[in-house]
């Protein structure tokens, strides 16, 4: 499993020792992006939705897409806009705004959403992110583990086997038998 190191990393001298690693740079805290693109193995550009949600802030998704388009190229990729604790319709509406090639981006399936939505996303996208939410907001607890098991059982039955990144649950993702590709 690839571990994406969340930024910003301070002090700056600590970041300088991490050449060749994988990084996650948020739209809400983009200061380390240039360094990470130049020195990292790959960069996951995060949409910043979780940070905005915790602060009660709104994100202008056009500005996000402008930021991504300047920097998106192989092997880097981006987490598409999502609504934390939103419903499936709100998240599907945001996916319709995507203007980037699918091989470079990943939609978020929130654990409180239906397994049918997960199946649909898996059939349509080469890469997905899982986000802990709702009754499954606490990574590692019994409900969360059961839901992750259910999700992987669904993915095993899909025609496409997308790469899956577990958002904000690196330790828990690595403790199970789940074949996550990435985590942070």
Regions found by a protein language model. Give the residues of each.
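Non-catalytic, usually N-terminal nucleic-acid engagement modules in DNA/RNA processing proteins
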Residues: 1-99
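Low-complexity, flexible helical/coil segments
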Residues: 37-39, 56-59, 77-83, 115-117, ...
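Conserved, mostly hydrophobic/aromatic
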Residues: 46, 107, 178
């Amino acid at each position: 499993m690839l571990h994406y190191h969340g930024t910003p990393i301070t002090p700056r001298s600590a970041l300088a020792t991490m050449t060749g690693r994988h990084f996650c740079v948020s739209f809400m805290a983009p200061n380390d992006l240039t360094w990470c693109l130049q020195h990292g193995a790959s960069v996951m550009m995060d949409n910043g939705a979780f940070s905005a949600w915790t602060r009660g802030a709104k994100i202008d998704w056009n500005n996000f897409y402008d930021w991504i388009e300047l920097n998106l190229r192989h092997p880097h990729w981006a987490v598409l806009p999502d609504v934390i604790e939103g419903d499936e319709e709100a998240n599907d509406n945001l996916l319709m705004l995507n203007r980037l090639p699918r091989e470079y981006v990943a939609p978020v399936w929130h654990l409180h959403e239906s397994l049918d939505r997960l199946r649909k996303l898996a059939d349509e996208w080469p890469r997905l992110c899982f986000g802990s939410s709702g009754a499954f907001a606490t990574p590692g607890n019994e409900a969360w583990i059961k839901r992750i098991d259910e999700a992987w059982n669904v993915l095993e039955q899909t025609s496409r086997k997308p790469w899956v990144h577990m958002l904000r649950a690196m330790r828990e993702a690595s403790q199970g038998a789940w074949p996550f590709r990435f985590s942070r």
